[in-house]
Amino acid sequence: GITPMKKILNRFGLGKLVYLFVALKQLLFLNPSQVSVNMDGNSETWSKVYFIAVMNQKYEGGGFKFCPNASSSDGMLDVIVVEGLSKLKVLFCLPTAFFGRHTRFRGIHIYQCRDISVESAVPLAIHKDGESGGIHTTFSVSMEPEQIQMIVPDSK
């Protein structure tokens, strides 16, 4: 659903700012945690992960260009891992994500894979296309080889 804050901001044409406010709120209260990731059989563990996003589009909530080279047609998942940074540095990097310029900062990693499984030391909030997926310590995402067939009416 739409939050009361988003409704107010929508009246002024600023609805996308709600995502920035949510990100700032999460950053203030979030403690980074140890996370282990397996991507296509390759494992990596980080001790101070702020968040991981698995995407097949460039943009996420409010226009953040977290995975600037993501494509829905390449058959790959694009993954961003933000880890090992101070909260101040994450705060500094966040606005650059609107333009996809955050990838140059140390502690921000971009990967491509077909399958990913994530295991966290503490339960984390999971979001699926902007909707809550609950609180979990593990999750997996796979890119399926089939594409959705679309039926589009003739334009007359």
Specify the residue positions occupied by each region the protein language model found:
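Long C-terminal subdomains/extensions of small-metabolite kinases
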Residues: G1-K156
